[in-house]
Amino acid sequence: FLSAIKSQNKKIAFLKIISGSIVLASGMSAWGGNQFFVIPIGLFILGLPFVRKDYNFLLWCIPLFVGTFLLISGLFERPGPAFVFGLGGLVLVTPTIFLILCIFLNKITHGKNFVRNGLVFLLSIIVIGSFVIIANGIPSESNFVYLPSFRYVNALFPILTSTDPLVDSVAEHASPTTDISFLFHSVWMIFAGIGIWLLLSKKISQNKIFLNNDSRLFVIIIGITGVYVSSVFIRLEVFASISLIILASLA
């Protein structure tokens, strides 16, 4: 997906988008934990209008990726239509709609105060979306967004606690401690810290680390979300490892 949106050849970009959506959907059918990648991708799409100017390209490649991914995901038994029409699909469809509306807003205003208008629009969507999710979480027959099982919701909101003794008794559902985190990632933390410094430092030319604005945005997003999600279950430390490896690769 990242390689596709950076490609200069539209035919190659099209093939990469299709193949990327197939690989992501296939991986999600094998392990439900791969639903994590929906979070950074959704946040990344939200930020694309602010870091990219080739709006005509974004208008077709992002909807194509999201549509193909959701279509293939719905064909599999897992995660299935419940994911497509539930919170997972909402996390991808909402940013895609936001991106399209932002591009049209930019054309209407001729680019004047685009960042300010876009941020206000984004804030309004976040507020409205929060109210919708909270209202949908109340058990009733009018629920229109399918919520996943508790362990997936717990990954989004680590402050939640389970009341099911069976869930708490599973070893891999234990909360990671500081000792375990340092045991798993002690080496990666050093290089990841250097990578963060290189990424954010103004004294170092970004050309030296070969990152443009959209790549830097994705690295920051996946770094934050990976560490955040891994704070819930010990088995989700794999996402902290992925985030730290990506950041450490910059060093």
Set out the residue ranges of the language-model regions.
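Transmembrane alpha-helical segments
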Residues: 1-5, 22, 39-50, 97-102, ...
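Short hydrophobic alpha-helices at membrane interfaces in multi-pass membrane enzymes
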Residues: 5-25, 55-71, 217-221
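Membrane-interfacial entry segments at the cytosolic side of transmembrane helices
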Residues: 12-15, 54-64, 83-92, 108-123, ...
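Transmembrane helix irregularities
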Residues: 22-34, 75-76, 228-232
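Hydrophobic core segments of alpha-helical transmembrane domains in multi-pass membrane transport
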Residues: 24, 45, 70, 124-132, ...
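Transmembrane-embedded, aromatic-rich helix segments that form part
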Residues: 34-47, 63-65, 81-97, 240
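Alpha-helical transmembrane segments at the extracellular/periplasmic loop-to-helix junctions
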Residues: 88-103, 120-204, 215-216
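Hydrophobic/aromatic-rich transmembrane helices and adjacent perimembrane loops
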Residues: 220, 225, 230-251
